[in-house]
């Protein structure tokens, strides 16, 4: 990595196939709940599991849950297709800059970009507290900027490997924060 001046990798954000599959399952469950709610309201009997559901309160609650599920499905599909959180982390030795870029929701601030000088970086920090593990850039002045979380990568070992690669590329220390 001595002759390489730019180290760049993409961050998937919400554009993962597991999010799409999860949204499809929530959609199917919501449709089943909506069907059960409508059939209980119209007092129709079916051969499925909802044979004896009274509209008030069970059918009404199932209708409410189905609407919540459909809204959640819409939100999940919207974040998937708009690539919310998708972006890249770029470490550029030639320009002496670290660039963190992500896509946000449509609007005035859809493009989220943060640039920092490599000279301002004190260390790369791996936090492994009880919550989700993450990598952050520790700037001079005790400012930590997280840029990779455990949920956005495959596993914690991949996060550690990326942190080691970044620290060795930049020539700065790697710190484990327990």
UniProtKB/Swiss-Prot annotation:
GO terms for biological process: photosynthesis. The chain crosses the membrane at residues 21-41, 61-81. GO terms for cellular component: chloroplast thylakoid membrane; photosystem I. Keywords: Chloroplast, Membrane, Photosynthesis, Plastid, Thylakoid, Transmembrane, Transmembrane helix. It is found in: Plastid, Chloroplast thylakoid membrane. Seems to be required for the assembly of the photosystem I complex. Belongs to the Ycf4 family. It is a multi-pass membrane protein. This is Photosystem I assembly protein Ycf4.
